[in-house]
């Protein structure tokens, strides 16, 4: 039933868009019986007024207010992604200045990921309760305060507190940007829009650590937070001046604060435990206890949301759930969310494992490691853009099959590394992998959200981003532990000793890559079997398009 409603809505909305683009404006001065003048970009009232789709997307193009607003949101979200990764290059300098251990210093990056993971489930309520301007301006004020605090902090605790505020400020921005794109663009143009946004987002991991290291070397780590403070102030001013509201909100909506608490302890506890699993044993109080609390909290959270939703649908209750999990009843959305989560789980570990191979086992510098991995990040940015355009033209199914297959081939190819491999083979395989990731991740996410009703997109965005955050947080530590297990077994088989340590470690990395490849292969199967229905498309469409292109060139 969910798919049939989505199919009908897909056609109805396209008709609505065509109708809205040919309708005479309300204040059209043309009083005669002649054909009305084409719709033009027209004033849409004060900045606090909600910009509806007929005003934001006119004659197949963004109106000026919508373009400015989307640019501001994309820039702010980019800053959030950039901030998350920028500090990794400055950790040695911070550790030296405050005389702390590397493990403690790592919390500057861990707490950012942890807080962002906690914030994402709350975005569904926030977008329901507050307007776009209220959310964005408040978030950037919090971000700016956090950046200033870290810049001026006399001790590590205040630097960490500033990072926490930065994460709170930026944690909601990606879901807000997704929801805004879906409220502006019609169904058959969302792939291109999300691909363009994904292009901007993918640049952040490519340049974040590099620019962070360069700025730290030139002017010290505090200059990074000074720069972010200035960017925060500029972003607040830009949002106040140029940002419009999108989508409807209910100022009277009430939050279920007990669900908020369950969400924080559930998702936060689970991610906290997995973050520590590389530093402590599984049964240690810093890992096992938070993970147990997290699992119990998530189970309680899910049961409470389902119970409230059922009571509301049955007319026996009026209180809304904090997060509408009914979206998981939609087959297309669930398939897309599972696919994206598997991709994050399998992909995140490689970003941890391969630098170990390049630096520890092959003896290359950290700078060289970054250069080897850099082409892949740029490839993913380009692939997300073209993947979005292909989604609009051919549908999600052929694009996702292509992407997941390329990702699988690249992963198994990378598993062929050895102690004497050409080092740029890693770069080539990572480039292939991230090309595949770009072609599968954004199209499958866009398609899965397209399967939902308009009023379910905010909940769907929160659910899918939460699942991806958890999968990413779990993937790296789980596969690193698997690598260490294979390494220990191989080291013992080789008789132990320092001279065989590197060979044993490479053996462990090879098997982790093979396991990751099997997960990618599972993703191919899920896409082939599960991605169906309106908007999914077929491989025949690509074939017909290619044949038409060949015939036109031969004439």
Please place each PLM-identified region on the residue numbering.
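Short, membrane-exposed interhelical loops at transmembrane-helix boundaries
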Residues: 494-508
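Hydrophobic transmembrane-helix bundles of small-molecule transporters
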Residues: 217-338, 364, 372, 512, ...
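12-transmembrane solute porter fold
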Residues: 66-82, 87-91, 99-124, 131-136, ...
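Transmembrane-helix bundle of Major Facilitator Superfamily
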Residues: 2-3, 31-241, 394, 406, ...
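Hydrophobic alpha-helical interface/terminus motif in multipass membrane transporters
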Residues: 91-94, 180-181, 215, 243, ...
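Peri-membrane helix termini and adjoining interfacial loops of integral membrane proteins
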Residues: 45-50, 314-315, 488-498
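Cytoplasmic-side transmembrane-helix entry/capping segments in multi-pass membrane proteins
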Residues: 190-200, 252-261, 287, 397-400
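Intrinsic disorder in cytosolic terminal tails and internal cytosolic loops
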Residues: 1-65, 530-555
């Amino acid at each position: 039933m969910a798919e049939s409603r989505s199919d009908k809505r897909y056609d109805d909305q396209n008709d609505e868009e065509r109708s809205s683009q040919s309708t005479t404006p309300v204040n059209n001065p043309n009083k005669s019986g002649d054909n009305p003048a084409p719709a033009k970009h027209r004033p849409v009232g004060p900045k606090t007024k909600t910009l509806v789709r007929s005003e934001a997307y006119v004659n197949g193009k963004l109106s000026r207010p919508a373009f400015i607003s989307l640019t501001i949101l994309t820039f702010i979200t980019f800053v959030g992604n950039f901030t998350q990764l920028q500090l990794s290059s400055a950790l040695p300098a911070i550790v030296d200045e405050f005389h702390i251990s590397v493990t403690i210093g790592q919390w500057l990056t861990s707490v950012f990921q942890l807080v962002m993971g906690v914030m994402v489930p709350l975005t569904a309520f926030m977008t329901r309760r507050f307007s776009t301007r209220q959310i964005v301006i408040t978030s950037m004020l919090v971000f700016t305060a956090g950046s200033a605090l870290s810049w001026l902090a006399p001790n590590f605790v205040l630097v960490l507190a500033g990072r926490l505020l930065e994460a709170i400020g930026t944690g909601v921005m990606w879901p807000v940007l997704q929801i805004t794109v879906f409220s502006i663009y019609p169904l058959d143009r969302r792939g291109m829009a999300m691909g363009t946004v994904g292009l901007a987002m993918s640049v952040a991991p490519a340049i974040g650590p590099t620019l962070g290291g360069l700025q730290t070397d030139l002017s010290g780590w505090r200059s990074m937070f000074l720069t972010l403070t200035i960017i925060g102030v500029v972003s607040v001013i830009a949002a106040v001046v140029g940002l419009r509201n999108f989508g409807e909100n209910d100022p009277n909506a009430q939050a279920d604060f007990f669900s908020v608490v369950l969400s924080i302890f559930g998702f936060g506890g689970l991610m906290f435990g997995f973050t520590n699993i590389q530093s402590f044993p599984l049964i240690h109080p810093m890992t096992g206890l938070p993970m147990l609390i997290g699992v119990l909290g998530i189970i309680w959270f899910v049961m409470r949301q389902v119970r409230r939703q059922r009571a509301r649908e049955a007319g026996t209750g009026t209180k809304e759930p904090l997060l509408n999990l009914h979206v998981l009843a939609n087959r297309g959305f669930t398939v897309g969310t599972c696919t994206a989560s598997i991709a994050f789980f399998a992909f995140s570990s490689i970003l941890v494992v391969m630098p170990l191979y390049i630096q520890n086992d092959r003896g290359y510098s950290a700078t060289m490691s970054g250069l080897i991995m850099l082409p892949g990040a740029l490839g993913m940015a380009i692939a997300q853009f073209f993947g979005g355009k292909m989604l609009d033209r051919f549908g999600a199914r052929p694009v996702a099959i292509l992407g997941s297959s390329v990702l699988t081939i690249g992963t198994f190819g990378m598993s062929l590394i050895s102690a004497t491999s050409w080092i740029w083979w890693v770069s080539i395989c990572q480039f292939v992998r991230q090309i595949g990731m770009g072609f599968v991740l954004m199209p499958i996410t866009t398609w899965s959200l397209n399967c939902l009703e308009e009023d379910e997109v905010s909940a769907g965005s929160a659910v899918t981003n939460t699942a991806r955050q958890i999968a990413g947080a779990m993937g790296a530590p789980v596969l690193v532990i698997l690598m260490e297990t294979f390494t220990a077994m191989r080291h013992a088989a080789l008789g132990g000793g320092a001279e065989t340590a590197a060979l044993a470690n490479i053996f462990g990395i090879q098997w982790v890559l093979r396991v990751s490849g099997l997960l990618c292969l599972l993703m191919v199967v899920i896409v082939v079997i599960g991605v169906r229905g309106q908007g999914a498309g077929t491989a025949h469409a690509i074939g017909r398009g290619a044949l038409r292109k060949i015939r036109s060139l031969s004439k």
